[in-house]
Amino acid sequence: MSEKKYVAYVGSYTHGSSRQGIHVYDVDVENGTLTERSSVEVSNASHMAVSKNGKYLYSIEDEGVAVFKRDKNGDLSRINSVNIDGMRGCFLSTDVDGKYLYVAGYHDGKVTVVHTHKDGRLGSLMDGVFHTGLGLSLIHI
């Protein structure tokens, strides 16, 4: 029997009065089952990423990005959130040192760089670049 415990974070779109956008599940690898343990309030958690050190979970939310502290059991507690000055993001990634969080969005073609603090807080927006045009140019013969 496996002694190691696994946790799954499932992000979802929210609607109506429900804002429970992240669901926390215990994963039983022996039996292949998921058991919902809790849910966390965040609107439209369409993408999530874990920090390089594993201590924090970043989530897209309606107007920006939220960060949650992961405790030793995998439970989440909100630290803070930042607005990304644009439409909703849809992808998150950190740099190799964990100093910056990159937020990309389909709707407005923007990539935003957010500073991350050692204590997990999201800081100021460092940069934002909008893509212009229609993507790959086609060569006509």
Q: Predicted regions: what is each one?
A:
Residues 2-4, 52-53, 96-97:
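Residue-level detector of Asp-centered blade-edge/turn motifs that repeat once per structural unit
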Residues 35-40, 77-82, 126, 135-136:
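A short beta-strand motif characteristic of beta-propeller blades
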Residues 139-141:
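Conserved small/polar residues in nucleotide/adenosyl-binding loops
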